[in-house]
């Protein structure tokens, strides 16, 4: 992967009305972010969007955007990335469910109308997920595995997938993982009940879902975006009704040029662990 230059960073103030989320948010997390923003008085890191048909599909930062909307702001600072280019990688998070009795989980899932829970052979899970022939796979603690199936177009399926996740979200601990290998997960989460594994989405899926006003469950899509702009610390007053977007973006251009000129923009290509979010 080539090295990014600071001049390639695309930052812009845009209207919140033009920002289209593709995933659900968590009201509890939104409330927490509202408190943090009110306390700090600035937006630390801009949400990430892809520009499409004069709209902005939100790839990362749904909680921040929902918080700003709930606070009554008109605009938001975003970082715009090329969703069709090689620099953005769309992957998936799987959900580790902890503390919910497996029998209760299965019974509750069976009660979701229009969802089919079908037992499958353990050797077919990867194949089904890669081929995107299922909406999800359920891997129980004892190794029993099930396919989650439903009918309809992609927006219909997302509505049902959100209902599936609602069965356990808020009723058990839910942790994100990049794999569904049970032995190491049980070692990490001794009270693991099950793992819900999801197929990878395509960027075209995310765009279609956002444009149609549908939502993917929170914590499923995983966008890997090198060159994220962090630590801008833009005052919240810049998200308000005045001045115009043109004036805000002129101010932003001057700010970015000044920080580049003063060597205050640095690229860290190595992976890092963040403990304060």
Segments from the language model and where they lie:
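Short, charged/polar connector segments at secondary-structure boundaries
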Residues: 1-55, 59, 63-83, 87-98, ...
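Internal, conserved structured core segments that host functional sites
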Residues: 98-159
């Amino acid at each position: 992967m080539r090295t990014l230059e600071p001049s390639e960073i695309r930052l812009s103030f845009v209207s919140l009305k033009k920002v289209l989320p593709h995933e659900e948010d968590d009201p509890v997390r939104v409330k927490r972010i509202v408190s943090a923003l009110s306390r700090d008085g600035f937006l630390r890191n801009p949400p990430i969007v892809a520009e499409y048909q004069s709209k902005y599909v939100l790839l990362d930062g749904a909680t921040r955007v929902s918080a700003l909307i709930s606070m009554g702001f008109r605009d938001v600072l975003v970082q715009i990335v090329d969703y069709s280019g090689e620099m953005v990688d769309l992957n998936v998070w799987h959900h580790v469910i902890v503390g919910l009795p497996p029998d209760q989980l299965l019974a509750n899932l069976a009660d979701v109308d229009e969802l089919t829970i079908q037992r499958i052979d353990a050797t077919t899970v990867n194949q089904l997920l890669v081929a995107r022939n299922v909406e999800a796979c359920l891997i129980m603690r004892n190794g029993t595995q099930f396919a989650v199936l439903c009918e309809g177009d992609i927006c219909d399926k997302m509505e049902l997938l959100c209902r599936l996740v609602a069965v356990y979200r808020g009723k058990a601990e839910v942790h994100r993982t990049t794999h569904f290998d049970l032995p190491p997960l049980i070692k990490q989460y001794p009270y693991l009940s099950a793992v819900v594994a999801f197929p990878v989405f395509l960027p075209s899926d995310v765009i279609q879902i956002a444009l149609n006003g549908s939502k993917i469950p929170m914590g499923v899509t995983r966008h890997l975006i090198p060159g994220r702009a962090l630590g801008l610390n833009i005052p919240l007053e810049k998200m308000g009704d005045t001045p115009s977007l043109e004036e805000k973006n002129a101010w932003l251009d001057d700010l970015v040029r000044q920080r580049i000129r003063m060597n205050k923009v640095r690229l860290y290509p190595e992976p890092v662990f963040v403990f304060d979010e």
